[in-house]
Amino acid sequence: MKRFIVLALCMLMVLETTKGLDFHNKDVESENSLWELYERWRSHHTVARSLEEKAKRFNVFKHNVKHIHETNKKDKSYKLKLNKFGDMTSEEFRRTYAGSNIKHHRMFQGEKKATKSFMYANVNTLPTSVDWRKNGAVTPVKNQGQCGSCWAFSTVVAVEGINQIRTKKLTSLSEQELVDCDTNQNQGCNGGLMDLAFEFIKEKGGLTSELVYPYKASDETCDTNKENAPVVSIDGHEDVPKNSEDDLMKAVANQPVSVAIDAGGSDFQFYSEGVFTGRCGTELNHGVAVVGYGTTIDGTKYWIVKNSWGEEWGEKGYIRMQRGIRHKEGLCGIAMEASYPLKNSNTNPSRLSLDSLKDEL
């Protein structure tokens, strides 16, 4: 078990069905053109502001637009786009959507101990690229909404993946069950840890489906009838050795892996496409899942990361993050807190309890 809880507030991210707004050189040439762009942006994303607030937010918006514009003119491997967060400062974004208090948990619980077991330690031959989406082991991108449940989404991606690998059946599982019922140490919309969620699933005998226990984006009372109708079980979990992208690669070559990252930077805030190489630290504040890796034509290595902010953010809900950097923690700390579920067979819980629940519904 990890020595501290990741994601106290997680990323309370909400994305509308609208996509990012395109703009051009003429839109940033003058104060008037920027104001017109701001009004278009507000209409595009249905953002209501008072007259007083508009004046304040317009200055923030100008700063962000210019940052996006200047960044996209540079020879970078990724692009930014003006999205829902166009008039939020970088600090507001970090405070609201990346507000995890990880240092407190580190000091309180101490550094985690060395990994006891890593089943892929002796794997020496790896494919040059892996994409579990192409292998049918990844469900469509989901949206956590205004709830700090990224830890639950990260957990579910990994469990859905290993279940499909073992059974050849892809089942969308319930994040809401984790939010409502895994509350002994995890804290629902106020954050949690993937390792604890894996152990909860193991101890409860499995996790039910999203169809049976749909997502509400809020803390609700645990529905024990639904909780007692598991459809997918696991046998525990293991941690990837800390600060080793090589070991993370070994794990991802065999199954999707839950990871924590620092997602609070402005470039992450406005990421749209390409291999992300932007500035970020190791203040882990968001749970995501690595579902593959690869290399671009020009030789840039990357991780394929599934997010939980809907398909409108990034590359249809995904971000490619640079892999193999010189810092041992990996870009944005991606190699610091990786773990994956264990499933030793192709069997799952009996459908009797699920069928009984469906009869009641």
From Swiss-Prot:
Cell compartments where the protein resides: Endoplasmic reticulum; Vacuole
Enzyme nomenclature, EC number: 3.4.22.-
Predominant location: endoplasmic reticulum
One GO CC annotation: plant-type vacuole
GO MF term list: cysteine-type endopeptidase activity
Mutant phenotype after disruption: Reduced male fertility due to impaired pollen development and abnormal pollen exine. Enhanced susceptibility to powdery mildew caused by the biotrophic ascomycete Erysiphe cruciferarum.
Disulfide pairings: 147-189, 181-222, 280-332
Organs and tissues of expression: Expressed in roots, stems, flowers, buds and green siliques. Found within columella, lateral root cap cells, and in the endodermis, the cortex and the epidermis during lateral root formation. Expressed in the abscission zones of the flower organs.
One GO term of the biological process aspect: programmed cell death involved in cell development
Active-site residues per Swiss-Prot or TrEMBL entry: 150, 286, 307
Propeptide: 21-125
Key words of the record: Disulfide bond, Endoplasmic reticulum, Hydrolase, Plant defense, Protease, Signal, Thiol protease, Vacuole, Zymogen
Regulation of activity: Inhibited by leupeptin and the cysteine protease inhibitor E64 (L-trans-epoxysuccinyl-leucylamide-(4-guanido)-butane).
InterPro entries: Papain-like_cys_pep_sf, Pept_asp_AS, Pept_cys_AS, Pept_his_AS, Peptidase_C1A, Peptidase_C1A_C, Peptidase_C1A_papain-like, Prot_inhib_I29
Residues of the signal peptide: 1-20
Presence of keyword Transcription regulation: no
Gene3D superfamilies, A to Z: Cysteine proteinases (3.90.70.10)
Pfam families: Inhibitor_I29, Peptidase_C1
Enzyme class: hydrolase
Motif range (Prevents secretion from ER): 358-361
Function: Possesses protease activity in vitro. Involved in the final stage of developmental programmed cell death and in intercalation of new cells. Cleaves extensins, thus probably supporting the final cell collapse. During the compatible interaction with the biotrophic powdery mildew fungus Erysiphe cruciferarum, involved in the control of late epidermal cell death that limits growth and susceptibility to the parasite. During anther development, involved in tapetal programmed cell death (PCD), leading to degeneration of tapetal cells and functional pollen formation.
Family membership: Belongs to the peptidase C1 family.
PANTHER family xref list: CYSTEINE PROTEASE FAMILY C1-RELATED (PTHR12411)
Protein name listed in UniProt: KDEL-tailed cysteine endopeptidase CEP1
Organism field: Arabidopsis thaliana (Mouse-ear cress)
Gene: CEP1
